[in-house]
Amino acid sequence: MIAWRLPLCVLLVAAVESHLGALGPKNVSQKDAEFERTYADDVNSELVNIYTFNHTVTRNRTEGVRVSVNVLNKQKGAPLLFVVRQKEAVVSFQVPLILRGLYQRKYLYQKVERTLCQPPTKNESEIQFFYVDVSTLSPVNTTYQLRVNRVDNFVLRTGELFTFNTTAAQPQYFKYEFPDGVDSVIVKVTSKKAFPCSVISIQDVLCPVYDLDNNVAFIGMYQTMTKKAAITVQRKDFPSNSFYVVVVVKTEDQACGGSLPFYPFVEDEPVDQGHRQKTLSVLVSQAVTSEAYVGGMLFCLGIFLSFYLLTVLLACWENWRQRKKTLLVAIDRACPESGHPRVLADSFPGSAPYEGYNYGSFENGSGSTDGLVESTGSGDLSYSYQDRSFDPVGARPRLDSMSSVEEDDYDTLTDIDSDKNVIRTKQYLCVADLARKDKRVLRKKYQIYFWNIATIAVFYALPVVQLVITYQTVVNVTGNQDICYYNFLCAHPLGNLSAFNNILSNLGYILLGLLFLLIILQREINHNRALLRNDLYALECGIPKHFGLFYAMGTALMMEGLLSACYHVCPNYTNFQFDTSFMYMIAGLCMLKLYQKRHPDINASAYSAYACLAIVIFFSVLGVVFGKGNTAFWIVFSVIHIISTLLLSTQLYYMGRWKLDSGIFRRILHVLYTDCIRQCSGPLYTDRMVLLVMGNIINWSLAAYGLIMRPNDFASYLLAIGICNLLLYFAFYIIMKLRSGERIKLIPLLCIVCTSVVWGFALFFFFQGLSTWQKTPAESREHNRDCILLDFFDDHDIWHFLSSIAMFGSFLVLLTLDDDLDTVQRDKIYVF
């Protein structure tokens, strides 16, 4: 059995040797080589050249070695293969080097340089050998040049700027060792020109080093770069207390926002990219210390806790002032029957006998508007309270009856004999005309705003938190820092968070939102106590006190802080709506609160209000996903925007006393015929018409701007629409308040002035634009800037500080704006 197998084995061995002899080289040329010397040799399929190098490696001294190769023959199909064999690593590359780009495009490089990874040594000094093997399958001679150099400045030093050149086929990397006492550094790389696009990578000191465009993303942290790049590196992430800074030029510029180069139509024809060289400078500087973290947190807490202290001091002062005032009134006007001062009907100046339920009318006490129209025609209409006589409050029936507080009672007027269509369509209305419903009914109605937004907040925030944690985990695991748009020059990590300072600065929204809730709670407690003791000022005077919307506003401010912090965990275009969703809520709630002040009975319900805000957020998401450059989307949105503006204008103008049904067009034509064609009559509600005309002009202009310009940041565009409408309504409210003879007390006036100033500074810092996800990550980093406050906070953090204070101040303005009316009867307070 063995006898016949032996000849077969001999034949197989002979065949293999014959095959290897046919494929393998005939000659091997080995020579000792020296550093800093250029070797020009030839190689073909019959010859392999081996160069032997040796150098002394010292344990406490790191030295870089760089191999440079240039193939002089431009031939296709048979590249040269260079293999560098070291003690613990092997590096191989072909020349011409072919790297692939987008759509598998091929780019050819005749000159290649690679830095060798130095293996560590345990001895004080050691002579190490490495070999460079050169081979090819080309049957003809191929001429090449080989040179091995020692790299000067291979080890980067803290605070020293180093400049170098690199290309896609000549990547560079350098070593940095953490000095004693330094736990964190920031690696800054800059260039005077944006292109060619490059990649900055931070890798552990291991072999091999991934320093080509097609493998640089395999390990470590990396980010694309045009003119700026910055990566914060912590000692705890590198057990060897050192790392490599790798710089690679990409084959194409599309990742950095550039255009694709011309590509030949010949299939598989590589493009020579030898001209893509970039000059860069690298600087490693110490990052902030733990003391800076503590100082930043104490500063942030100190600023906002000072508002708590100021609020307590103001509350104590106001309490002392009220006690003093009450004591003086008690001395001057003590009532012997009750033994303590109490506001009576005749204590209101200018009161007249009560004449039934038409207390919203003027002068004659009737429900007719003839007198008003007549006065208007003569130009003698006055907006001051002193020129009108009103009914006494004491003789008026209580509006907070013990009737049912079911949902069906929300839109009933059982406490009057007049039809609400008559009351609400009078030419001139007073707050008493629109504050006729049961107080408990309205309280329940407006409390729904708070409970609904609390529910929305929970269901919205939990998935958001989960998602941004996933984003941060992906960044930490993959090392791809292009996922998140930080200000990398001022991004201070803490734990797993990459930019803790941007998250910390959102604390103001939460703390000031909570403070606003506490202020509202105190006001509500005081108001309820006044109601319990039948204080007629609380019962019959001033703007009706409903606190549900204020609670909703405070909750929205807190949620804005939470969601803004979530957005800044990993800011990018896919989660920007997290940062803006509750801004829409705040803008909408503020407008509703302004409207509720003078229209408590007919304000929108929480369900319809939040449904409208949900539609806004829905369009925000659609705009982010589909709106960029999509003409059809912008046409549809602009049409919906204009139609919604017209419908809302009609609702506000007619105080809800109109119907959207099949007869709407017939009624419109009838109004146009009677008021414009038969006789030219002006609008019945002039003030409302002025506001709505201005609002329509602004909204139509914004719709036209969006349709023509089609801004990339749709979420901010949508927010701008809400803010413009809020500012317009707020300005109209203040103007009409002053025009009606009312005044603004000192505290709200100070709030208005201070808030306006703070908003101005806040917007200045907001428009600094430290990053933008409307561009590529590399282009966004061109806007990055160093910290400007305590070496810990950047411009956007200051925007967070100031905008939270400004929002809090704006809420206080809404809360205190009508405090001057607390002693004015509601049938003397105009509706506008």
From Swiss-Prot:
Glycosylated. One of its GO terms (cellular component) is plasma membrane. This is SID1 transmembrane family member 2. GO terms for molecular function: AP-1 adaptor complex binding; AP-2 adaptor complex binding; DNA binding; double-stranded RNA binding; nucleic acid transmembrane transporter activity; RNA transmembrane transporter activity. Residues 315-447, 521-546, 627-631, 710-715, 768-796 are cytoplasmic. The modification Phosphoserine is found at residues 401, 403-404. GO terms for biological process: cell morphogenesis; glucose homeostasis; regulation of insulin secretion involved in cellular response to glucose stimulus; response to glucose; RNA catabolic process; RNA transport; type B pancreatic cell development; type B pancreatic cell proliferation. Mediates the translocation of RNA and DNA across the lysosomal membrane during RNA and DNA autophagy (RDA), a process in which RNA or DNA is directly imported into lysosomes in an ATP-dependent manner, and degraded. Involved in the uptake of single-stranded oligonucleotides by living cells, a process called gymnosis. In vitro, mediates the uptake of linear DNA more efficiently than that of circular DNA, but exhibits similar uptake efficacy toward RNA and DNA. Binds long double-stranded RNA (dsRNA) (500 - 700 base pairs), but not dsRNA shorter than 100 bp. It is found in: Lysosome membrane; Cell membrane. Interacts with adapter protein complex 1 (AP-1) and AP-2, but not AP-3 and AP-4. Interacts with LAMP2. It comes from Rattus norvegicus. The chain crosses the membrane at residues 294-314, 448-468, 500-520, 547-567, 606-626, 632-652, 689-709, 716-736, 747-767, 797-817. Keywords: Cell membrane, DNA-binding, Glycoprotein, Lysosome, Membrane, Phosphoprotein, RNA-binding, Signal, Transmembrane, Transmembrane helix, Transport. It is a multi-pass membrane protein. Belongs to the SID1 family. Glycans are attached at residues 27, 54, 60, 123, 141, 165, 476, 496, 572, 603. Residues 1-15 form the signal peptide. Highly expressed in the liver, brain, kidney and intestine (at protein level). Its main location: membrane. Residues 16-293, 469-499, 568-605, 653-688, 737-746, 818-832 are extracellular.
